[in-house]
UniProtKB/Swiss-Prot annotation:
Protein name, entry field: Deoxyguanosinetriphosphate triphosphohydrolase-like protein
Lipoprotein found in the keyword field: no
GO molecular function: dGTPase activity
Pfam families with a match to the protein in the record: HD, HD_assoc
Every HD domain range: 69-217
Location of the region described as Disordered in the Swiss-Prot/TrEMBL record: 1-33
Length: 404
C-alpha cells in the first residue's frame, strides 16, 4: 500500500458507534462521530490554546521558529494520522489523542515538571499524564452540565495509557510505577470510571504514543540544528542518520546546511513512519486480533518499531540527550526555570491570598486543609504558560531570571 493511502476500516480499530460512552450522558451529534466531537472539544479548549506559549525545549522568547507544545502536538497529530490511515484505524480518535497528550504539561517543559514533582513529593508528586486527565475531566469549565470536556472512554483511556498499562491484572503497579505507585489522580479517577489501567490501550492510542516519539526525535534535531547546538555532520555519530545523510549527499552534493537539515528531518520522519507501520502490520498478522478488545488483552503492544529501528531510535535520543538536552546553554535556562516554578509554589503556599480570586476556595484560604491547598496550587501553576509564570514571578518577587 502506498504511504498516505487509506486502508479499509479494520475490525480491530475503535468504532465510534460502539464507544463505551462518556461520564455524563449526552445525545449523539447528527453530523459528527463521537471521536470527532472529542477532537473538536480538545481543539476549542483553553488548555489547548495555552500550548502555544508552553516550552518544548527552548523558552518562548528565544525564536519564532522553535517548537512549542502546540506545534509539537500538531506535528504528532499529522504523523499519527498518517500511520492510522495505513492501518485502517479511526483517524479522529488518533488525532484527538495526539492533540491532547501534552495538555497537562506545566510551564517550561520538563523543568517545570521536575520542580512541581519536588514540591509535591509528600503529596503524591506530579505526573503530566495525570494532570492531562484532570484537565480533560475537571479543570476545563466550558459546559453547563459538567466540568471538563466529557470525552469518550476511549479518549480518556488513551491519555492515561500513553506509556502503556500501569498495573498488572492484580492491580500491582508495573515496574515504572513500582517505587511511587500509580499516579494518584489516575488511580482515583479509574475507581470512579474504570479505565482498565491493567490492559493495553487501543491501537489508535498506541499509534499516537509512537508518533510522539517520532516527532520528538525529528523535530528536536531540527531545533538543535537551528540553535547551532550541533551540525548535520555531527549526526553521523548515529548509524541511521549517517546513512540518511550519505544518501542526501549523493543526491544533492551542493545542498546548503539548512536544507540538508530539513531534508534529513523529512527523510527521518518518513523512515520511522515506514518502519513502525511495517512492524505493526507484522505483529497484527501474527496476533490476528479480531476486535479492539483483542488488542487491549494482548500480551504485548501491537504498535512498535522493529528491533533494529528501536536501537537506532534510542541512539538518536542518546545523541540529543548529550548534544541538546544536557547542553549547558539549555541546562542553565532550565535551572532558572525550575527555580521560578518552585518559588511560585512556595509563595502561594505561604500566601494563598496571592492567588487570583477565581483560584481561591469559596470559604477562603484559611478554611482549606494543606492537601487541598497544594492541589489547588498545583492545578494553577500547571496551567500557566511560560510567559504567565514569568509575569507572576515578576509581580511577586524582587528579582526574576530572564531565561536567556
Amino acid at each position: 500500500m502506498s504511504v498516505g493511502m487509506a486502508a479499509p476500516r479494520a475490525a480491530f480499530s475503535c468504532d465510534p458507534d460502539r464507544s463505551r460512552g462518556r461520564q455524563f450522558a449526552e445525545p449523539p451529534s447528527s453530523n459528527r462521530s463521537a471521536f470527532r466531537r472529542d477532537c473538536d472539544r480538545v481543539i476549542h479548549s483553553n488548555a489547548f490554546r495555552r500550548l502555544k506559549h508552553k516550552t518544548q525545549v527552548f523558552v518562548f522568547h528565544e525564536g519564532d521558529h522553535y517548537r512549542t507544545r502546540l506545534t509539537h502536538s500538531l506535528e504528532v497529530a499529522q504523523i499519527a494520522r498518517a500511520i492510522a490511515r495505513q492501518l485502517g484505524l479511526d483517524e479522529d480518535l488518533t488525532e484527538t489523542l495526539a492533540l491532547a497528550h501534552d495538555l497537562g504539561h506545566p510551564p517550561f517543559g520538563h523543568a517545570g515538571e521536575r520542580a512541581l514533582d519536588a514540591c509535591l513529593r509528600d503529596h503524591g508528586g506530579f505526573d503530566h499524564n495525570a494532570q492531562t486527565l484532570r484537565v480533560l475531566t475537571a479543570l476545563e469549565h466550558r459546559y453547563p452540565g459538567f466540568d471538563g470536556l466529557n470525552l469518550t472512554w476511549e479518549t480518556l483511556e488513551g491519555v492515561v495509557k500513553h506509556n502503556g498499562p500501569l498495573t498488572d491484572r492484580t492491580g500491582a503497579p508495573l515496574p515504572r510505577h513500582a517505587e511511587r505507585g500509580v499516579p494518584i489522580g489516575i488511580a482515583e479517577f479509574s475507581q470512579r470510571f474504570d479505565l482498565e489501567i491493567w490492559s493495553f490501550a487501543s491501537l489508535e492510542a498506541q499509534v499516537a504514543a509512537l508518533a510522539d516519539d517520532i516527532a520528538y526525535d525529528a523535530h528536536d534535531i531540527d531545533d538543535g540544528l537551528r540553535a547551532g547546538l550541533f551540525r548535520v555532520d555531527d549526526l553521523r555519530a548515529v548509524p541511521l542518520t549517517a546513512a540518511l545523510i550519505d544518501g542526501i549527499s549523493r543526491r544533492y552534493p551542493a545542498l546548503g546546511e539548512s536544507r540538508r537539515g530539513a531534508e534529513l528531518v523529512r527523510e527521518l520522519i518518513s523512515h520511522l513512519i515506514g518502519a513502525v507501520t511495517a512492524e505493526t502490520m507484522r505483529r497484527l498478522g501474527e496476533a490476528a486480533p479480531r476486535s479492539v478488545e483483542d488488542v487491549r488483552h494482548a500480551s504485548t503492544a501491537m504498535v512498535a518499531f522493529p528491533s533494529e529501528t528501536a536501537v537506532a531510535e534510542a541512539e538518536i535520543k542518546a545523541f540529543l540527550w548529550t548534544h541538546m538536552y544536557r547542553a549547558e546553554r539549555v541546562m542553565a535556562v532550565m535551572r532558572d526555570a525550575e527555580a521560578i516554578v518552585a518559588d511560585l509554589f512556595r509563595r502561594y503556599c505561604e500566601h494563598p491570598a496571592d492567588l487570583p480570586p477565581d483560584w481561591l476556595p469559596a470559604d477562603g484560604p484559611v478554611a482549606e486543609c494543606e492537601a487541598d491547598r497544594f492541589r489547588r496550587i498545583r492545578n494553577f501553576i500547571a496551567g500557566m504558560t511560560d510567559r504567565y509564570a514569568l509575569t507572576e514571578h515578576q509581580r511577586l518577587f524582587d528579582s526574576t531570571p530572564d531565561l536567556r
